[in-house]
Amino acid sequence: MDPRELAERLTERDLRILIHLAESGEATPEELAESLDVDLGPVMRSLYWLEERGLIESEEETHEVYELGDEGKEYAEEGLPELRIVEVLRKIGGEGRLEEVLDRAGVPRKLAGPVLGWLRRKGLAEIKREDGETSLVLLEEEPEDVDQSVLEALAAEGSASVEELARKLEMDEEEVEKALKRLSERGDVLRAREETVKKVRLTERGEEVAEHAPEVLERDWITELKPEHLREGTWKEKEFKPYDVKAPTSPTFPGKRHPLKEVINEIRRIFLEMGFVEVSGPLVESSFWNFDALFQPQDHAAREMQDTFYLKEPAEAELPDEEVVEKVRAVHEDGGDTGSRGWGYEWDEGVARKTVLRTHTTAVSVRKLYEVEGPPLKAFSIGRVYRRETVDYKHLPEFHQCEGIVLAKDVSFRDLLGILEEFYRRMGFEEVRFRPAYFPYTVLSVEPEVYFEEKGDWVELGGAGIFRPEVLQPLGFDPDVVCLAWGLGVERLAMLKLGIDDIRDLYMSDLKTLLELPTARARR
């Protein structure tokens, strides 16, 4: 596209920016916004678009910016202590007793030494000692103090660089730097920080387009079709400005659910579509349902205080009917009627009564199995679970799990693998594989893994298996009844779907991050 045609496609703001840069050579976005009398946001969008088209180039420069500290604000308003002393001396005839002058100038005794030093250093006054008396003698009645000028300039501007101060005060930069150095030696007078400034300038291509900018701005053409143009027919006599459909616009942030909530809703939708019913259970659970009913021994490491949250109040929970409790006791001690040898220890009902914050949603599944009369049953649950984890990029003490079960007489291990493969396929993962695993309450047991293309690796996403007879038979199910079961970490799945490497980012309240995160379905 030739320079003239490109100029015709630019907005009025773009053209004015090019003209300004052609005249000034370079400018900051803030300077352009002030010159064009528009907000900084639209200027930044224009600069981004112009740079994308190769019409301008940008460069970032880092320099020190100064602002006043608490003492500096006081001195800017009331004057530096040495200048206040000069004013007092001038009013009393050029000489006075030291204590009297300090008092009238409002200079604390603790600052007397440093202030006298500045008086001598700047040649404003000298100390005279005579007959045991110490006096101050004025040497300069109307000093032009650069330090005070810098303080007042910073008070007016808020903050400024050496270059900006020199320009405002019409001084050499070297003179301003010396003043800043002196002021920096005086406690909390100045505060310095680094600031990065972006400057833009025209490229060779931009200079060619800028030559046509004034002419294009002066053209009398229609930039926006209005009702009066149609009503009066004036559109027939005028030229329409070319419309660039690729021109940048303000970003739109419509309302949306929290990204983690999106993932949870997608999981729920998929299981409902697959014919499952959703069930739920209490967050505060008895150790019986959380551990014992799942054939997890009472001395298992997962039940220790460093892994599980035990409650002080209520400290104990009620157990189900005695028949179920006794059957669970039997499978733990000697296997009961299951053919298993159990764990070979004396089961303690008191330990089973202890209350915990549930450590997994499998407790919801086993409660549901206790409540139903028999197969068939296809159920899932999604809920919060709690573990004593050290918080890091992949662990939280509170997180979500999804649990599912299929209770039937005519299902097998292959059905379990098929259900999981279909679920992950609907979640957007085409490649799924299973690795052998061990869990106390399932046999056979596997860990599903999905291939994550962006990382080029396989990622484990949960655990699955067939509930052992030691879990099902105490609940009243016949030996020919099979229960497929699985559980997965929702946050880990969400991290993959959303492209997040740190699990803590899912719970950040930073609005910018939440606005920019894609929805879960956007990455399918």
UniProtKB/Swiss-Prot annotation:
It comes from Methanopyrus kandleri (strain AV19 / DSM 6324 / JCM 9639 / NBRC 100938). Keywords: Aminoacyl-tRNA synthetase, ATP-binding, Cytoplasm, Ligase, Magnesium, Metal-binding, Nucleotide-binding, Protein biosynthesis. Its EC number is 6.1.1.20. Its cofactor is Mg(2+). Belongs to the class-II aminoacyl-tRNA synthetase family. Phe-tRNA synthetase alpha subunit type 2 subfamily. It is an enzyme of class 6 (ligase). This is Phenylalanine--tRNA ligase alpha subunit. GO terms for biological process: phenylalanyl-tRNA aminoacylation. It comes from the Archaea. Tetramer of two alpha and two beta subunits. Its main location: cytoplasm.
